């Protein structure tokens, strides 16, 4: 699973994105919003990607009316496939790709 630090409002995604990871991240976003409706939430991404529908579950939650704080995204190491979309969904002006991070995007395919 990903690492979540509620006190510092930071999430580290260091694995493939699937439904379980998406559910964990969405729950953390809601919990952090309940704790403080304004303070930014930081998401650090080092992921080979994963299931596109799971990534959109996270993205939709980030952009929903239920998550009011800005969500800042940072790419560390690699952001491939669906993880690149997650990185791009961060708050405009607060999407960062560190110097040695690699990005990769390809034609998207839905499962099934």
Task: Pin down the residues of each PLM region.
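Terminal-region recognition feature
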Residues: 1-112
């Amino acid at each position: 699973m990903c690492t979540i630090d509620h006190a510092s409002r930071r999430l580290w995604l260091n694995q493939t994105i699937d439904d379980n990871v998406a559910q964990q991240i969405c729950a953390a976003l809601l919990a952090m919003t309940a704790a403080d409706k304004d303070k930014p939430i930081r998401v650090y991404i080092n992921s080979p990607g994963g299931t596109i529908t799971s990534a959109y579950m996270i993205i939709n939650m980030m952009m929903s009316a239920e998550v009011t704080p800005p969500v800042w995204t940072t790419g560390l190491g690699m952001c491939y496939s669906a993880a690149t979309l997650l990185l791009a969904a961060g708050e405009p002006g607060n999407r960062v790709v560190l110097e040695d991070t690699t990005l990769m995007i390809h034609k998207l395919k839905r499962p099934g």
